[in-house]
Amino acid sequence: MDREERKTINQGQEDEMEIYGYNLSRWKLAIVSLGVICSGGFLLLLLYWMPEWRVKATCVRAAIKDCEVVLLRTTDEFKMWFCAKIRVLSLETYPVSSPKSMSNKLSNGHAVCLIENPTEENRHRISKYSQTESQQIRYFTHHSVKYFWNDTIHNFDFLKGLDEGVSCTSIYEKHSAGLTKGMHAYRKLLYGVNEIAVKVPSVFKLLIKEVLNPFYIFQLFSVILWSTDEYYYYALAIVVMSIVSIVSSLYSIRKQYVMLHDMVATHSTVRVSVCRVNEEIEEIFSTDLVPGDVMVIPLNGTIMPCDAVLINGTCIVNESMLTGESVPVTKTNLPNPSVDVKGIGDELYNPETHKRHTLFCGTTVIQTRFYTGELVKAIVVRTGFSTSKGQLVRSILYPKPTDFKLYRDAYLFLLCLVAVAGIGFIYTIINSILNEVQVGVIIIESLDIITITVPPALPAAMTAGIVYAQRRLKKIGIFCISPQRINICGQLNLVCFDKTGTLTEDGLDLWGIQRVENARFLSPEENVCNEMLVKSQFVACMATCHSLTKIEGVLSGDPLDLKMFEAIGWILEEATEEETALHNRIMPTVVRPPKQLLPESTPAGNQEMELFELPATYEIGIVRQFPFSSALQRMSVVARVLGDRKMDAYMKGAPEAIAGLCKPETVPVDFQNVLEDFTKQGFRVIALAHRKLESKLTWHKVQNISRDAIENNMDFMGLIIMQNKLKQETPAVLEDLHKANIRTVMVTGDSMLTAVSVARDCGMILPQDKVIIAEALPPKDGKVAKINWHYADSLTQCSHPSAIDPEAIPVKLVHDSLEDLQMTRYHFAMNGKSFSVILEHFQDLVPKLMLHGTVFARMAPDQKTQLIEALQNVDYFVGMCGDGANDCGALKRAHGGISLSELEASVASPFTSKTPSISCVPNLIREGRAALITSFCVFKFMALYSIIQYFSVTLLYSILSNLGDFQFLFIDLAIILVVVFTMSLNPAWKELVAQRPPSGLISGALLFSVLSQIIICIGFQSLGFFWVKQQPWYEVWHPKSDACNTTGSGFWNSSHVDNETELDEHNIQNYENTTVFFISSFQYLIVAIAFSKGKPFRQPCYKNYFFVFSVIFLYIFILFIMLYPVASVDQVLQIVCVPYQWRVTMLIIVLVNAFVSITVEESVDRWGKCCLPWALGCRKKTPKAKYMYLAQELLVDPEWPPKPQTTTEAKALVKENGSCQIITIT
């Protein structure tokens, strides 16, 4: 297509699409209508299945600006097509019609968002999105998102709220007053109703959609064909099967819609209060909210109906619906830069960056804290499907297709079957013409061969193994919302684990503290709860610097904060709503020690105790809280001791981050050594700091001060040492994964040294393995980005505490020769900042680091997702196991994401384990491997079933015969369906093995297995077909034939003394038919046994009792009616009587067939991989997986791994391949 006629929307995002414009063509529409009539409606079906064909067949290309229909194509590997109709939104209905008065309602720039003020510069902006004469805006809707035409960028763009391009200053200055009713009405016209509409389709609509599936259309075609040929019984059986399948599918689909609808309907129609510009409070429905509305958060809490940024007060929020984390989160108001001591006026508001100040849609506000007369307010920033919950629901409603080689190969194999059917189709026509068969019979029989080759039961058979695996997973507490992922889990060869709560216990135990006095560490202390420390600043920090709250009288919050607070034994008291309402200011949360801990003596005259001048009651009020930020790695509070004039600032967080914000002279010289000693033992270390604030800081000023103004120039107070024990099962599970050649990677928000220590303790890194730390620094002061390579085991102290970088890893440079490094295993470790720098500036190093990267510390949620993608880019099948809190994106992105949660199902993860243990990972992989092998077995069996039956019919067509109606029925229902659904019941093998199942159907061993069985079955079937004609008793069968009585005892043939039957119009009853029917019936069972694989991925087939019973029963039944014919059975199956000696001969043919088939299949299993390439003269091929190919390259690369005391610098002008150079430091 012409490049000028193509645009790209959502550029650089996951849902990036190309867009083409079209206008409806009347003459094309007329031609298509004629084609639909001539094709009997088939063309209409084809156009329904193929949206791009439908648009191109009925429309002509047009400029995108003026088009009536848009054709969309995703730019990912799937290249999926969608079409949407252009609609026009008229602005004439808006009460204020002047374009100038509307200039502040629409946005500018490359993202369609709200304009902040109606300046002269913005007055023309409405013309970008509307025709100035008619005041109309053109838009289309795709996947619940509206895209509006933007004249500035000459493209469609989606409408945004206040979540992008709006500064924090603007939030307060231009949006905190609320909207007028006119502005509200106008924005509602653009944004529409604030709802996440998951409409449950009617049963009729779902039925039509399901019935129009290509598979069911093919079945309908088959049924009509069979009915025409008077194969009524088999046609009826297929109809019954189809009805059962459709009803089951409809029930399942509708149930999922209802569940999703119920999940999102909780906030759909709640009443909310909003503030208008004249300070009027108006009560409206939540569906009427628009970005810019100022919403009042009720005192008793609510379920948030939108995304909103908090500008007044504090909220306690449960975000478990979005994150899976049940611990309540404290949300504080967004800092107001205009009143900050140290402003951040240039900072743009972002819901992710400022998530501690953002209330997300669907989350539950449990409690609020407020000023009297100053309600708890939040400004609506996103509504409907643009909210965080809306985006989550969209990802469920419109999932990305699963890219798995098995499914691609399955479609390819179906095409092969269609090609085989085409050959049979042509052969049947030619053969029938040569034998002067009637035209009607030729058409029916030639079409019939197609329905035989492509079996109608194939889709149901393929899903059987997955359904059984899902049931087995549910029994062991693993719930699945994406069954197709089970097969993919069978291919996992790398698993990422979160640390806290996943590899280690959720709870932390306080091991002890190590205080600092006069810039020196004191000896570690285990008992914090004693009289000597009760009024120290250290304990005051532990008592106040947390986000704990009481919910229904129970102390709740982060487990680390709970352990820390419980260790000192203090009491936390929160003001009630009534108490707060009696004061002119917010009532703070108060903490105080129990009476028995307070010293009875009067305060000493030392500097420490002069702060406490009211010995009667010693209480500390928490005035302001700056919540913990994973990006900043710290939290802080402003507190005041009762009776003291000055306030105190307390801070806690990652030791490196805290030390970097403290006065250098207060940080001990041996800080790094002490920190290293603890972290290398796997302790979680938290640093504390304190600062006395100026007396001029009033209560109200503190409420609006920025955290940067507080968190600086602190006094370092010491360390809290928490013990985070490994879960009991962790080492054993990781050892099982390593034995199975499955790589394990740690992705954590904890510190580097702690993560490396835990990795060694749990066996992820073996004692003899090297750990190379990649410390990447971004470009700075004209210098290019660089990576410093260090070794984790050679840490030393930093001689200049003042130069401590919060993210720097102090490492002693190693001068030793490391020539033996290639002979030892090595692992890369890095933190989140280094990972981001490497992704941006060292793209060619990313695959190499992914090959041996084992520890990724201080990783933010989005960085975890980027890591999963980087691993997938080198062809790893990646699993992710986490607690669901910060891992939602990574869990969804991984091939197999499993969340450890008490909930039965989490929308954030394909799999959810009710048992909070990583033992679910090997269980999931085992079941995935079993399901994958089952899929292979079933597919191979169904392929052989098609070819065997296809060849049987082709042989019989050569003599103008066919299989009978009940013969088809017996084979397809009694044999095939029973075998398929029972052979899928094999449970998973009891342990993981190093061998992995193949990922696709197109592999040498698998193809050889199928082709060899096809040849064997065709050979023995042909042998029986042609050999029977050579028998001395053979003749063209007719009702008076008496071959049964020519030889053998009358006992065997007594049931066939009377062969008088009605005329056989279809020539079903003959010796060739009987021979082919018996031999082929046994062949289905033979290949079922041959293909029913057991160890090492499934339990042996003899432990599948239903399968064994079914096969034995069918064998006995077929053998019985072959050797001991029953007249009634033979009459129904249209079998003719043959001499007993021929029955024995057929039995011998079947036994030899079974021996050859099973022997060949066992040989392929045992020696196929090693012998087939040699036998075919194939040289060793380059590994298909990128990571395997890369590993071979790195084995002969003398520059890899990087040696210690070296630096990798990015070139000043980075080329497209991200080339870099190695510079050795001397």
UniProtKB/Swiss-Prot annotation:
Segments on the Lumenal face: 227-232, 431-448, 962, 1021-1073, 1127-1143
Membrane topology value: Multi-pass membrane protein
GO molecular function: ABC-type putrescine transporter activity; ATP binding; ATP hydrolysis activity; ATPase-coupled monoatomic cation transmembrane transporter activity; metal ion binding; P-type ion transporter activity; P-type transmembrane transporter activity; polyamine transmembrane transporter activity
Keywords: ATP-binding, Endosome, Magnesium, Membrane, Metal-binding, Nucleotide-binding, Phosphoprotein, Translocase, Transmembrane, Transmembrane helix
A cellular component annotation (GO) from this entry: recycling endosome membrane
Intramembrane runs of residues: 29-49
GO biological process terms on file: intracellular calcium ion homeostasis; polyamine transmembrane transport
EC identifiers of the protein: 7.6.2.16
Protein name: Polyamine-transporting ATPase 13A3
Provenance organism: Homo sapiens
Native organism taxonomy: Eukaryota, Metazoa, Chordata, Craniata, Vertebrata
Recorded name of the encoding gene: ATP13A3
